[in-house]
């Protein structure tokens, strides 16, 4: 006989009523299940963190301004939504027309070809092309509601003053995805404002957008590519670069924004399911988990095994992984822990895990092998993961000093104005100071005073040179940044640096007023670098003395040869 029943029987014999025991037993089991269920929000904050975020917003000017900016961007749409709830959802790019609510899309030569099937609800429209075009979407107010054709009104990026034009669906570049990302980002931000303030108008707005996206994605099968233009036939077949619903898995980012709307507005979402889910007897949590896992499962066998494609691929998958329940909640045993193990410990034939990712960094220089934009975009992504992974019980910084070295490797490649050097297919611009914010949070939490001083110095320099402002932190900054940046002494910069892999030398003299700097680039093939002979560039007063060619327009545009005078920037020499 089961010992539990023997115990109950004996208690009953001693005069304790069976009903009370069973009630206590059921209550205890319910408490155990409640402990096992995932609380929300859970990715960047827990429910108990709301008070500290509110205090930060109230007491710190930068946080108050950052929160006000988030709220102001969404509130006009939220207020309209109370009387006109279809206005925003009708602007999602969907297959709206009954009879053409496709459940299966096909691509050909890396462009949308045709669709099949007809779902009981509108389904999410697939982007028209893998490549981009010269247009951006007109403002939301000017977009076509319930757009049945997929043709998009666009503004010429090269000449924005021109009248807008209607761009055919199959020539729409990234306009479809950009439209849906914009609207889901509004939902994400509104969900955050709801979590902070408790104002349900923000939750309703976020929920209505999320629900239309969720049921519209639920009825979609992964795209098919019969001619393997993206590396496989698509569907669930491993290999190639297609995502669940984009030509490139690293661009399959609708799920990132949807996952955060789900996380912040979870309690409201669960109470307000889409009418169609109620009609088919399904609940929001079950369907959301299924949809999130589709993006993850496709992502795990697509994209790139190494390099920035691998890191960017994990970046798409991480948030939906973290909003899942624990393994035992799912019939296939694949919940949060299962998927995180593949990121943190276990490389696969399709994706390197973090230990193998970190082997890519040069142990001496701390540099990633690709050009500057990719090098520091990659370490930024890794450090972006640090806070949510630590909340999930995983510290990726403590045992990996190369990750900290990689973040600091940006300094030799910055000029005095905190701009990045330019070579290969990088586009320059300011360094990403969020890298240092992430480290400041970590070092503060681990009481690493030396680390705090180094990254605080970089942040203070960016602020003093007006290259960085915490006022633009966004909700991730409000959740994770320290309340203040300590005042510390300025860090001295390296006089010279050399990367044999990149064939790149920097030399600096920042002691005087001129802030002089010199770079010499040799170039090589691959890694987003360019084998263009020797290129010299001179800087003074914190600026390049002549314009650099920077990156090309796109991967698909032709190369252009150029040459300047001996004193010009990026003079190309034979060799």
Q: Language-model features: where?
A:
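Low-complexity, Ser/Thr/Pro/Gly-enriched N-terminal "stalk/linker" regions
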Residues: 38-168
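Positively charged n-region of N-terminal signal peptides that target proteins for export
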Residues: 2-3, 17-21
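Extended polysaccharide-engagement surfaces of secreted carbohydrate-active enzymes
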Residues: 45, 50-55, 62-65, 369-575
